């Protein structure tokens, strides 16, 4: 009750909040906003031209690799918020269905295992102090490689099964 001077949260309880995890995610979302506000997003999208003319499977593998490894340095939510509009716009130029690019990006953004900032579970595990970043990087690298292959394969099969239209 605020009228009696009671607070919703006292310092004793605030002290137990994992502030480091909250700051990591706040920083990631801020970075996504800065990337869009500064025009860096357009620069990133322009780099997609390197994939033009490649077979669709290589484009999907490239997008999965880009997204999964980029997610290691910012939160998956921030990365998805930044990359989905960029890759949706680039899909027709790349010669693959927009839905397929969005699927790879969305799933890939959640498949990052190397760094604490990548996903909330990574941050929680790192926050326990029982695992070091070096251990996360070693194990996470191979999980990322497996994820790239599996996600790309699934998205290619889904593209065929759902008969997604190729851009003209």
Task: Identify the residue ranges that each predicted region occupies.
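Transmembrane helical cores of multi-pass ion-transport proteins
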Residues: 1-168
């Amino acid at each position: 009750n605020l009228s009696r001077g009671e607070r919703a949260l006292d310092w004793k309880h605030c002290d137990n909040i994992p502030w480091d995890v909250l700051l990591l995610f706040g920083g990631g979302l801020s970075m996504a906003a800065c990337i869009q506000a500064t025009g860096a997003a357009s620069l990133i999208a322009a780099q997609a031209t390197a994939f033009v003319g490649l077979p669709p499977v290589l484009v999907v593998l490239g997008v999965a690799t880009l997204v999964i490894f980029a997610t290691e340095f910012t939160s998956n939510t921030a990365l998805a918020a930044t990359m989905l509009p960029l890759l949706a716009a680039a899909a027709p130029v790349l010669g693959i269905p927009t839905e397929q690019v969005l699927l790879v990006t969305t799933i890939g953004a959640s498949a990052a295992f190397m760094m604490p900032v990548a996903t909330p579970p990574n941050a929680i595990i790192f926050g326990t102090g029982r695992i070091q970043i070096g251990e996360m990087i070693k194990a996470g690298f191979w999980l990322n490689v497996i994820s790239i292959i599996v996600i790309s394969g699934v998205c290619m099969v889904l593209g065929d099964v759902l008969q997604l239209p190729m851009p003209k």
